[in-house]
Amino acid sequence: MRYAVLVTGPAGAGKSTFCASLITHAQTIGRSVHLVNLDPAADKFEYEPTIDIRDLINLEDVMEELEFGPNGGLIYCFEYLLNNLDWLEDELGAYEDDYLIIDCPGQIELYTHVPLLPRLATFLSTSLNFRTSAVYLIDSQFMQDKSKFFAGVMSAMSCMLSLGISMLCLMSKMDLVKDKKGRTKREVGRYLDPDPNLLLEDINQGTNSKFNQLNRAVVSLIEDQNIVSFLPLDVTSEDSVNTVLSHIDNMMQYGEDEEPKVPKDMDDGDFD
């Protein structure tokens, strides 16, 4: 069985750093993992990608030759990838019983406005028979701005519904908010398990009254759906990364269908 984790979220949320931490931890526990880069604009990685979309198409070349802007060029690159899925299938063909960590671009329009990442997720899970899940990261600094935080919640909800696969939401960079502003665990908990009333407490006072009805509609939507909650992520803590990996494994039922592997020396039948 093959496994794939799509690492998604807005730009600056810490996706690449999370990928590196996850790979480091997986290697320490003896798990075979591979990094797949799907960002044609990426410039550097802590771990060299095993599979890299830049070997197929490069954003800089697209922008120069077609005179596209960054977002239009990125969408073109992804459309090109989806029109050449045989390339991806060939690249993935050699990796049996392995765990792929797929670093995705930070432009949310790839899954909220155009169905590019959803099509990729479907291809992985149905055509290539990967057990596929996703994680969605938002920056813990969003807790300093409630309107920005709830925009992140709505974006996570949109991603979850668009991808149509199991998804884990992570509050990244928690190491940066420890002991700041005297936040108690209860206060942080209202963000990890989003309390819609947070939006109404201050937002209505700080915005034009004509937005009050919109704020109430957002609150009602979050309450009615009730599908987004966050797991805290501190990449400086091995326990935190291990907890996240355990949740991902549980989503994909990792290892449940694997046959016990017999050590090679026992295979040979030589016990001398």
UniProtKB/Swiss-Prot annotation:
Keywords: GTP-binding, Hydrolase, Nucleotide-binding
Residue numbers spanned by region Disordered: 253-272
Ligand binding (GTP): 12-17, 172-175
GO biological process: mitotic sister chromatid cohesion; protein import into nucleus
InterPro entries per UniProt: Gpn, Gpn3, P-loop_NTPase
Site (Stabilizes the phosphate intermediate): 71
Motif Gly-Pro-Asn (GPN)-loop: where in chain: 69-71
Alphabetized GO MF terms: GTP binding; GTPase activity
UniProt cross-references to SUPFAM superfamilies, sorted A to Z: P-loop containing nucleoside triphosphate hydrolases
Assembly and binders: Heterodimers with GPN1 or GPN2. Binds to RNA polymerase II (RNAPII).
UniProt family annotation: Belongs to the GPN-loop GTPase family.
Function: Small GTPase required for proper nuclear import of RNA polymerase II and III (RNAPII and RNAPIII). May act at an RNAP assembly step prior to nuclear import.
Protein name, per record: GPN-loop GTPase 3
